[in-house]
């Protein structure tokens, strides 16, 4: 697709192996607004070998609203500058990311963004940056990160950021991911942070 477009707009979405969605700037690869009684089974399923590629300027790879969505993604995600991989704005959402290939981002991106205070995110993807001002995971819910985050480039990169009383956990009893972040530019308030909670204007 071109700019200002939607690749798929629906409720239950399944992308099989070798499936590919590519959209341009200010666009959405997959938008789902499903309402479900439970998040027990995947409502958006992206198989291993599938690819989602989005352009720059507020594009989103997978955008979900609704209730009790269950997003299971093994897709390769390619994100343009000033854009998002996953955006969750529903309630009771479960997002599981388990892609085998590393995800590389440039500048001003957010790999996973969630305003769902009742949601859960588990990330196993390895994230790598080549630029500045990127967020790995920004969430109001519960996050478990099980993938390395290599954000050592540029300035002002943040591994995980928790808001609205959310909770972020790096690793478990068997997996111990490494978060590497960039330098800070204090003059311009661009801080390299591994994990942080809350919000400040200072």
PLM region spans:
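Beta-strand-rich solenoid/repeat architectures in extracellular/passenger domains
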Residues: 1-4, 12-26, 41-58, 68-82, ...
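Beta-strand repeat architectures
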Residues: 34-35, 64-68, 90-91, 165, ...
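Short aromatic-glycine motifs in intrinsically disordered, low-complexity regions
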Residues: 8-10, 36-40, 89-91, 114, ...
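Long amphipathic alpha-helical scaffold regions
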Residues: 161-167, 180-182, 197
């Amino acid at each position: 697709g071109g700019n200002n477009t939607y690749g798929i707009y629906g409720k239950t979405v399944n992308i099989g192996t070798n499936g590919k969605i590519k959209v341009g700037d200010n666009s959405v690869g997959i938008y789902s607004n499903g309402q479900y009684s439970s998040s027990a089974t995947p409502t958006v399923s992206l198989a291993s070998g599938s690819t989602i590629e989005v352009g720059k300027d507020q594009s989103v790879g997978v955008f979900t609203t609704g209730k009790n969505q269950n997003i299971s993604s093994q897709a390769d995600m390619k994100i343009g500058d000033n854009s998002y991989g996953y955006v969750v704005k529903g309630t009771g959402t479960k997002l599981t990311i388990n892609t085998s290939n590393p995800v590389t981002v440039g500048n001003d991106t957010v790999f996973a963004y969630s305003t769902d205070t009742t949601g859960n995110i588990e990330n196993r993807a390895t994230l790598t940056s080549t630029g500045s001002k990127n967020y790995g995971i920004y969430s109001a819910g519960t996050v478990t990160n099980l993938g390395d985050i290599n954000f050592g480039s540029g300035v002002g990169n943040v591994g995980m950021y928790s808001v609205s009383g959310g909770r972020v956990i790096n690793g478990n009893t068997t997996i111990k991911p490494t978060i590497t972040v960039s330098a800070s530019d204090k003059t311009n308030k661009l801080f390299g942070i591994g994990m942080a909670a809350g919000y400040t204007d200072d």
